[in-house]
Amino acid sequence: MKVKIKCWNGVATWLWVANDENCGICRMAFNGCCPDCKVPGDDCPLVWGQCSHCFHMHCILKWLHAQQVQQHCPMCRQEWKFKE
């Protein structure tokens, strides 16, 4: 017996792999997007600090811009440095 496939519709899904489920700044889910973005994905990436905390890129950039003197992680207050 042979089976012939006449039509095939592929479906894919993606998820960010992060320590938490929600951004510590905006409290939105990582599999969604930050309040500044309309659609989740590459335009709203996640970024990690050397302290291992993770945030939406736009959220942490706003947070760091608001810090006048020293830029600290909003979760642990260590000096913020992006993980490479």
Swiss-Prot record:
Pathway: Protein modification; protein ubiquitination. Zn(2+) 2 binds at residues 51, 53, 73, 76. Zn(2+) 1 binds at residues 23, 26, 56, 59. It is found in: Cytoplasm; Nucleus. Changing residue 53 to S: Greatly reduces autoubiquitination activity; in isoform 1. Disulfide bonds: none annotated. A zinc finger (RING-type) spans 34-77. Keywords: Cell cycle, Cell division, Cytoplasm, Metal-binding, Mitosis, Nucleus, Ubl conjugation, Ubl conjugation pathway, Zinc, Zinc-finger. Changing residue 23 to S: Greatly reduces autoubiquitination activity; in isoform 1. Expressed at high levels in skeletal muscle and heart; in moderate levels in brain, kidney, and liver; and at low levels in colon, thymus, spleen, small intestine, placenta, lung and peripheral blood leukocyte. The mammalian APC/C is composed at least of 14 distinct subunits ANAPC1, ANAPC2, CDC27/APC3, ANAPC4, ANAPC5, CDC16/APC6, ANAPC7, CDC23/APC8, ANAPC10, ANAPC11, CDC26/APC12, ANAPC13, ANAPC15 and ANAPC16 that assemble into a complex of at least 19 chains with a combined molecular mass of around 1.2 MDa; APC/C interacts with FZR1 and FBXO5. Interacts with the cullin domain of ANAPC2. Interacts with UBE2D2. This is Anaphase-promoting complex subunit 11. It comes from Homo sapiens (Human).
